[in-house]
Amino acid sequence: MHYKTKNNKFIITAFILLISIALTDKATAQIFGGLQNPLGVNWRQINTSGFQIIYPVEMESEAQRMANNIRYIFPKVGRSLNVRKTTIPIVFQNQGVIANGFVQLGPKKSEFNTTPPQQFDSQDWLNNLAVHELRHAAQFDKLTNGRAYPFPEQVYFAWMGISIPLWFFEGDAVSNETSLTHAGRGRQPNWIMPYRTALLQGKNLSYSKANFGSQKDVAPGYYQIGYLMASQIRQAAGKFVFDSVLTDIKDRPVRIYPFAKSLKKYSGKNGKDWYEYTSAKVKADWEKQAELSPAKDYPVLNQEAKYATDYSLPVKMTDGKILVLKQSKAMPAAFVLIDQDKREQRIQGIGQQEQPWFSYANNLIVWDEVRLDPRFQQRSYSVICTYNLQTRKLNKLSSKSRIFSPTLSADGSKIVAVQIDFSNKVQLIVMDAANGKIIRTYPNPENLLIQTPSFNNDGSVITYVSVKEAGKALWTVDASGKTTKLINETPQQLSRPIFLGANIAFNAHYNGINNIYSIDVNSKKISALSASKYGAFNPSVIKGTDSILFNNYNLFGYEIAQTKIEEQKPGKDNFVFFGAAAEKQENTGNVFDNIPDSSFTSTPYHKLGHLINIHSLIPVIEDEYKGGLQFNSNNLLNTFDAYAGVNYQRDLGRFEYNAGASFKSLYPIFNLTYSNRPRRTFYATGAGTRQGDWRENYVRLQAVVPINLSAQNHNYNFSVNAGTSYTQRYDTQNLPANFVTAIHFPLETGFTFTHTTRTAERDIAPKWAQIVRFSYYSQPFDKQLSGDLFAVAGFLYFPGLAKNHSFLANFNYQEATGIRTYNNDINTVYGYNNIMAKSRLKNTLLFNYRFPLFYPDAELGPLAYIRNVRGGVFCHYENVGTDSNLSQPKTYGFELHGNMNLLRYQPNVDLGTRFVFVNKEYHHNPIFELIVNYTF
């Protein structure tokens, strides 16, 4: 048997990407040189106290406000790390509708996605981002000795990813946002609810599972675990414990697991020990809370879940069926009808949402859905869609809109929703449900952030939640525009109010657990309608009864429950606040109180004047024979990337010099690369085989137009590319007289079309997908080197025999002439490079069937955490019709893969083996391959 190892090209950015995951406000990684804004965005800047705030002109008012806030709060944000000042650019991104924020190095910057979400904390959105992301800036400054530009930034970033676990970065930042304000995620029961539920139900999660997640169970994640651990560590070891830990890591940077060792030095325990201590401590505290909080058991109206599954926003239909938005580890989001026997019928899949949301009335479903700009994907939209259950007609009511939380009137004729423009101006609007026309806009003179509105039964009154720095409030507005505040600003997590006759039901956590409450609009008396053990959400009225449907949280997610409307006292607040010690240590109150109101000079930010931003010198390893150093430059707006470097080719004993740039401001992306490189060839002569060497200058220009579209659960991608190059060879040694010294402008063209359906976490591949790819290479300007290559590839993905199985049929064809006769531009059979070919490669037909085997969630000490194990079989044909037929594949066999985290690092490593059996006509032994890939 032959042994072969297959590896990805390794570059130090593997660890750079690792840590970028840690420092996004959601678990979504920032990809360097990633998304762009449209060319027409007009940028300005404010420079104050080390902060360079770069923002679109529409955000002038918010930029002035945040310039005051950021420079005032940073000394308090960094105080427990002994970091008093910083230098960092902050880019305000206002073109998108996905709420997020991050800090990075390489280049050093922070980005705030300024459009506020419809459900988050009980404070101003940009303030919430600032107090969290600035803590990351302080962490970085502590680790880089406070250097404004810590060159080489990507090396520092990679070192941080290797040295420090993600739970610290995010847990410390969440602890900070919680202790410095009246809000913060540490004060939200629903944020920590999955972990509380698991512990109280006797589900003890391993350290790795809690941090890295599961494809089987609901796992809390490193934000939540990190907050709890950081809180316990600060309580035990004091306010400045992390200052000491990070200083020790900075002073002794080259060690194995430096964070664990430094943490043990200053707190007495390493990370895993602190996790076990914290789990036991919070479990005991939550058990006491459960004893003090009377709770009810509610019958479950959906099928018993075997893995993490959410049945969100249940609504009872007139025929007794229940409509929900279902999503699970094995199923992407879709509307589902559930009958009285708990049988499920899938109705319609949907696309990405900022949060799960829909409304139903009179056979009509309405929801909002995120759509990305086809080219400039920093810009996204929130569009309104409807689906008629009777006619099965799908309709998109708005295009290129920024409309959120649509809710139908009882007769299904009107939609109330929230609209937010590029300046963060918020409006409550009413739309015609038939055509999407805005028929009314309500005044919002204070520009409160409005969330989750809904109509009363006759459509004459609307209720909604507002958010500002002081907290959340509950309101009504009538047909005349008169507003009434029913609940004053509070840190309670008020959300999704609906009318119950003359009263209003809503979600809050008055007893320390998220439950459903109601308020009498006349007396303003608040009563409890549910008494859930872990959390109750999303009430809906069952017409003609005195009951409501709602989501009751349990071990595997959001279940469907029902209860009678019986008003009870809200009960005592028994919430367990684990951040109390850190809050007392900081002793700041709300850092956003008493902010100065200064006015700052605003100047244009010229994109062309800021294209070059050299931030790093990194090692690059291409393979076992070639490696070197590379300077990297990325501008702050992700529109221009450049690099220059040198590699040493060990097998040739010579250096190679490279440079390149990518310009991404326009609809096409232009890529220019240059290389001065050594080359070697072997050629036959009458005296035998001889070796020839030369150097060459190689210049390549390419233009790519990537177009991405989406609609419901379907995604479409079109990509057109064209390129050419010029090669000039010199310093020739031992080469024949007819050796070509110049290659003039060969043309490369290609087109790719991709259609995929939305996938679930367990899906190995899309259930349905089609890919067609064409490429053509020619030599129109160089007659002495004539030769063409045309290639086409088609990929068809189908569902397998069981859930999450995948079958792929891939057909490839190429026709090559002239100097390209022996070139290859198509996928080959497994084992191709090890097997002697019968003839030139013209086509391949590749069948692959892949399937999950089990989900062990197995922690092998500190070595590995195995998330899933998958199998696959394959049958591959080459040159069908000449060298093989459908009964005689060239290769066939099976493979086994495991998805895991190694050494407690974040990248998902796919480690696998493949056994390739070769058709007996080739007289070749079986081939064994070891496969190593990674994703982030």
Where are these regions (language model features)?
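C-terminal outer-membrane beta-barrel translocator/porin domains of Gram-negative envelope proteins
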Residues: 687-689, 737-869, 881, 932
